[in-house]
């Protein structure tokens, strides 16, 4: 399994950043039902004004190749388009992890079983 973690720094006033972040979050949270390779999606909006990053997403896909499938899917491209003109910076980390403990939580749904890490 692969975790795809992305943080975003947005431009604009605090109110504008909050509005854009909420719309982006809502669009991202709809993606698992639209993109087959997307096992899960978590999105957080920063609540600490002392920190400089506004949004983080954590997506789980079976393989590193699936990150590209997810990234190029039209639904993801549309969600990413919501940040047009509002994105100051982006940082990303993709890493493989073994989901043995997740498979206990999710059972035969296949987290990890399909990717062979068990």
Where are these regions (language model features)?
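Short S/T/G/P-rich N-terminal loop/turn motif that feeds into the first structured element of a domain
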Residues: 1-54, 62-69, 95-118
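C-terminal structural segments of small proteins and small subunits
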Residues: 64-93
């Amino acid at each position: 399994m692969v975790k795809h973690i992305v943080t975003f720094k947005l431009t604009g006033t605090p109110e504008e950043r909050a509005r854009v972040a909420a719309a982006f979050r809502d669009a991202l949270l709809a993606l698992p039902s639209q993109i087959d390779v997307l096992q899960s999606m978590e999105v957080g909006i920063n609540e600490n004004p002392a920190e400089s990053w506004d949004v983080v997403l954590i997506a789980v896909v079976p393989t590193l190749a699936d990150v590209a499938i997810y990234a190029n899917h039209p639904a993801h491209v549309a969600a990413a388009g919501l940040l047009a003109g509002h994105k100051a910076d982006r940082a990303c980390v993709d890493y493989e992890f073994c989901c043995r403990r997740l498979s206990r939580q999710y059972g035969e749904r296949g987290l990890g079983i399909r990717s062979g890490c068990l």
